A protein has these predicted regions:
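DEDD superfamily 3′-5′ metal-dependent exonuclease/proofreading module
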Residues: 1-79
Length: 79
């Protein structure tokens, strides 16, 4: 999945739809939150795949390199 720019861009710009970090882009989720999902299991479906991808991005320290792909939302969504 890391080699498909469209999948990567969609995952980076996907907004978390529920929970403590609802409304935050997946790329801006805290790493401990993604580690928790990794240990408990990612949700089924596309969101789970996107969370797993963002987990791998953060695990490998690539989030700064991918920051230019984040589409502006009109407000600062980095809490």
């Amino acid at each position: 999945m890391l080699d498909d720019p469209k999948v990567l861009s969609e995952a980076i710009n996907q907004v978390m739809p529920f929970g403590k970090y609802a409304g935050r882009k997946l790329i801006h989720l805290p790493e401990p939150y993604l580690v928790w999902f990794y240990s408990k299991g990612f949700p089924e479906g596309k969101l789970g795949q996107q969370l797993a991808l963002i987990y791998e991005v953060k695990l490998n320290g690539l989030e700064k390199m991918l920051e230019p792909l984040v589409k502006p939302t009109g407000f600062n969504d980095r809490f």
